[in-house]
C-alpha cells in the first residue's frame, strides 16, 4: 500500500475510533473521505457527521464537534480541523509524514512507483499491427506510442503483459504486394511485359525490393507462376517487416510476439474455429454464404464468414486469432485499433460470446486521427517524397522523445493536432522539453552538491522541509504510485504524461521559491535527498512513456 493510501486508511480508522469513543453509533457506516476541490479547505474532508444524523439523532454540527473532540490527532497526522457548513469536517494534515517517501524513492530507484504485488492476471496487448505493405505513418505512430506506454503502465501496476504485433500476411493485400514486386523484379531484369496489378503498390520501396531480388535471386524468374508468387509473397513480407521492425525499434517500441496470420491457416485453427461455431449452432447458410449469428450478442447485423465464392472474409481469421489469444491463457485482451475499425468492436465481442467467453475480457481502444501541423497549417505530404509523411520522417524531424511524448499527451479517443514546430522548440512552452529540463536541472544541482561534499545518502532528518512548495512537491511524488494504478485501471497512458507535467511544474515552483543548497547544512542535506527522490520519480515516469531523461541540456 502506498503512503497516500496508508494515511487515508489511518485517518478513516481514527475517525471510526472517535465515533466509538463519543458513543455516536453502535454500527459505523462507511466513512468516505475526499480531497476538497479548494486546497484552502484542507487535505481531506468527510461528510460522516451528516450521515450519522439519523443514527445519533443529533445536529450534524454537534456530531462533527464530538468527532473532533475525540480524535487522536497525532495518530491521524492531523494538525488542524475545521467544521464547515452543515457539518463537513475538513482535515489539515501534519505533512511531515510525506517525508517518508524520500528514502523510499531513493531505496527503490528505478522500481519506485511499481506495485509490489502481482495482479495475477495475464494481459495480451495487441497494437500497431500495420499491414506489411508499406511504411508506418502518423496513425501507426500514435498506436505504437500509446500501446507501448500502456504496456509499461500495466506492467508497473502488477499485470503480466504480453506485447503482440499481428502480421496480416495472408490476405489479398499480400498477393497485390507480391504481384507488384514481381513486376518490379522483371523490370529490373529488362522484361517490361508484366503490368502492375490494379491495387498494386507503386512506392519506391517496391522498386528497390524488385532490384535487390533481381540482383540476389535472379533464379526466381525460372519458377512456375504459382511458385514464383508464393516466393514473392514470403519475401515481400520479410522485406517489409524488417523495415517496420527497424523503425519500431528506433521508436523505442518492442514486442514479445510477432504473430503471423498465416500460422492460423497452417495450424488449422481457422477450420477448428469454424467447426466449433457450427457445432454450437451459431452459423447458418444464406445466399450461398456462411454467416455468424452475431445479432444474438448485441451486434447490429449478422456477419459473413465465408463468401458465396468460397473465400473467407477478414472476419473469420480475426475470430480464430482472438480465440487463439484466449487459448493461450490470457485473462484480458486489449486491442488498439485505428479509427477505421470502429465497426469491428461489436462483431469481435459477439464472436467471443459464441464460444462462451465473456466479451468484457476483450477491450478495444480506437485511436482517433492525428493531424500533423506546421506553422498553423496541416501537413499532409512529405516535402521530400511527395507521399504521406512516415514515422521515419517524424522521428528525423522532431526526434523520438518529442514524438513519443506528444502522441501520449491526449486520450486516444480524441482527435489530436501534432504541432511539429512546438515539438522542436527548446523552450518551456514545449511540454517534453519542460519535463526533461526539470530532470537535467536536478542533475546539475546534485552535481554541485557533490562538489560541496554533500551526498544524497547523508540526509536522515527531514524536519527542515517546511516550505509550502516543497510539501506540494512531495505530495506529487507520493502520488506517483496511485497515478500508475489509476492509469492502469482506466487503460489511460495520458494520465502519466499529465502527471509528468504536474511533477515538473511543482519542481520548478519549488526551485523558484527556495534555494536548494543553503548555508544550513542539515536543510541542504534534506533538500538534496528530496530532489533526488523527485529525479527518480521523473525519470521513471518519463521511461513509462518511452522518453529519455537527460542529465544535461
Curated annotation (Swiss-Prot):
Pfam families found in the cross-reference section: Arg_tRNA_synt_N, DALR_1, tRNA-synt_1d
Keyword terms of this UniProt record: Aminoacyl-tRNA synthetase, ATP-binding, Cytoplasm, Ligase, Nucleotide-binding, Protein biosynthesis
Chief subcellular location: cytoplasm
One GO cellular component term noted in the UniProt record for this chain: cytoplasm
Keyword hit for Hydrolase: no
Catalytic activity: tRNA(Arg) + L-arginine + ATP = L-arginyl-tRNA(Arg) + AMP + diphosphate
CDD domains: ArgRS_core (cd00671)
HAMAP family, sorted: Arg_tRNA_synth
Protein name: Arginine--tRNA ligase
